């Protein structure tokens, strides 16, 4: 299984990468919207997406990546406002 990790926090991105690789998954990393557009393709089976990227909204990015293939996603956010979490 190939998992795309789109997270701007280096420490969290590396922790997710290490944990998933230790469990046998293949990962593709991106630290920004721009990197995700460049690195993530339709070969991924799951996306882990930070909602608050420095160069764009993670939800809009996810919708853009969905154009060629429907990919399930887990969204991450550091925001604790209920409105943001329900988004």
Question: Which role fits each region the language model picked out?
Answer:
Residues 1-87:
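N-terminal/domain-start alpha-helical segments
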């Amino acid at each position: 299984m190939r998992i795309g990790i789109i997270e701007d926090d280096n420490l969290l991105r590396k922790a997710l990468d290490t944990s998933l690789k230790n469990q046998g998954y293949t990962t593709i990393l991106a630290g920004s919207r721009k990197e995700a557009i460049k690195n993530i393709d339709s070969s991924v089976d799951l996306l882990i997406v930070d909602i608050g990227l420095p160069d764009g909204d993670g939800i809009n990015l996810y919708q853009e990546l969905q154009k060629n293939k429907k990919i399930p996603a887990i969204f991450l956010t550091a925001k604790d406002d209920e409105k943001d979490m329900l988004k």
